[in-house]
Structure formats: C-alpha cells, structure tokens
C-alpha cells in the first residue's frame, strides 16, 4: 500500500480492489454474455430451414479462418462424420479439420461469442454469431483442439471443453457457463484434428442434419472453387463415404479459367466451372477499414460434360466465400458470384442493397455502398464470360438470361436502383453477343436478329 496525494482527497492510502468488486465484475460479464446470446438461442428453439442448411458452412468457415493469419499454412482438410450412438440411437455429428491452433483470443471468442477480427481481409467471419447457428443440431457441444499457450505463438497445448447452451432462462444459461468452465481440461499433448461433437437428440436436429447435408452436396464444389484454402473434404454419412477433391485448374484464355471438382462416392461425377475474377486496390474499402484493401470478385458459370450451361434458377448463387443460403429469395442472376467483400445481413441470408451509400458523419462508404460498388465490377466479368461462351458455341446459352425478366421484392433491395443498375446492365451486355441458337440451323445469332415465337403450354408439354 502507498499513500496517494491528491489535493481533492488529501492523503489517501491505495489498496487492492476489494474481492467483492471482482466478483461483481464476473457477474456483470456473465450477464453481458447472456444478453449477447439469449435472443439467438431462443430463435434456435424453432430454427428456420435456412438455419438448418447453414450449420455446415459456419463450421467450414470457422475452420478456414483458423489459417487466415498463419503464414505457414494455406490449405486445410475437412472431415464431416455422421454416425449413430449405439447405446441410445441418437445421431452424432462430428466436424473435424486440421487447421491451425486457436489463439487465446479466438478460443474465448468462440466460447463467449464475439468476432475476433472483422478487419482482417482474409477472414470470412463477420459478426461472431455464425457459430450459434450450429446449435440447431444441439446446444451441447464438445470441442477437442489445440491452442497457442504463449503470446509469441511458439508453444502449443491441447484442450477439451464442452459448451452447455441448453438453458431456457438466464439463470440456466449462466449455470451452463459454470459447467463449461468446469469442463475445461488442458493437455501437454496435442490433438491431430480439431473436432466439434454434437449429440443430436431432437427431431428438429435430425432435420437439420438432413437439410444441412443436402445443401452441402449442392454447394460444396462452388465453395471449394471460391475457398482455395479447402484442399479436400470428406463426408462420412453413416459409412457412406463422399470425397470432394480439387483437380488442377486449366487456363482457357488470359483471364478465363476452367476448374473441376471430382466427387467420389456411391456415384462419381465431375463438376466443371468456367470462371474469371477481379482483384484491384479499392480506395473506399481501404479508407473504411483503415488498411490497404483490394476489392475481390469471382464470377462463374457451371457447364456439364457436353459443354452445356447448367441451370441455376432457384439455387444459391451468391457467396461470401461461403454460400449465402437464403439469398435466392432476394437475388436471381445469370452468374455464380463470390466476393469476400460482400456485406450481408447478420444472418448472411441477403445483401444490404438499400439505404444510403456514404456515411457523411464518418466520411466512409456504407455496407450498402460497398455492395453496390462490387456490382460495378461484376458486369465486365459477365461480358468476358458471355463472349467466351458465345465464341466457343457452348450449349443452352439461354441460361445467361436467368433472372433478367423480373426483380424480386425484398426489404433489403432498392427495387428501382436494382432494375436500372443491375438488370438493365446485364441485358445490355447480353444483346452484344451471339447467344441464341437459331432453329433453322443457321447457327448462333444476336438476340436482336431473332424472332421469338411464344409456344402454347401444350406444345411445351409435348417437347
């Protein structure tokens, strides 16, 4: 203790903070945590179908983000294992990856729900809320992993911890925090894989397994196209093994590539994507995030083995590295589009495309402004792809007009802006190229050179 001389206090003796202060601080922090998670956990008592589809992507995103700052790593491998508990018949979901160890901050961010680093442009995470979505499987989750045990990130230890987020009221959630802390165990030895284990006991959780795996199968090839960090992904669904492997990319032209993904399992197939990209320094992004930032965009179309375009109507075609599941109710366009710089809503189900584009008070671009700015760079990519496909006479080019006949109504979409600055732009580009296959055998024509005959419903049914 030492005397403190202050003209307002006289001479006082400083003492350590009273123990009651520390205990009160812990209680307040616990209540702040409850405030942070309670609403979302309550929503997940009756999860939406989109929630049930998203859990696998949230886990893949977390795995990918573990190497965002690790200069010694550029790829990870993932295993998803679905099995039955032989003792009680419950389903067990195990998600494994061999990414980098947790930092102390990242581990606590996962356990206490906050996003560690939105400013890192290599990190896909936005809000720290995504992992909560995985609780549509189960609100009790056991984690086995490794963490750096020193600030210099030179030493590693293993750990296990079980999250208990199954409480109904605040006091039960706080009790779950106590149980979580008591479950923590640290080891000198490390684990080969980071593993998240969910014991699924409810019908809703079993439905989440079903919808999540269906969405996984539909979108994993596109995700691997845009997420170069994924070297391989293996799904073991009760002994039925599916492996997705990236094949070497083929350079078709100076800026057009072909990427293929071999899917092996009960049936074998190869999914093929023709794609191009844009990456340039962006002043507005750099100013907003106080760091040198590039705007990055990928645009792709899927083609089959006969070089016909694949229909993407009604599918998830927008990616912020991971698929923005649910965005199909807002946007329907001719391309599969990815940008790590997209600004989605908090549940990653739509893009923010309404409201002001510039924050005058802070003198920075808004989330809406960023998304609109990304669109300006999509159209040159669309033009390159349409030209390549038309020049090489790919089939079913009418899919390049997908979504261009109408605009969806959505609360986060400025309908008038979207029609003038998106739909009309796509149409202008499409009119420039020979994309219509004439029925008289005279080859491909520009749309303005064609006469379109509207067939009756009966004629269409007969074809």
Language-model features and meaning:
Residues 45-49, 119-127, 367:
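Alpha-helix N-cap/helix-initiation motif
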Residues 86-96:
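Short, highly conserved beta-strand within the GHKL-type HATPase_c fold
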Residues 2-21, 25, 38-42, 83-84, ...:
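GHKL/Bergerat-fold ATPase module
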Residues 95-152:
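Flexible ATP-lid and adjacent glycine-rich G1/G2 motifs of the Bergerat
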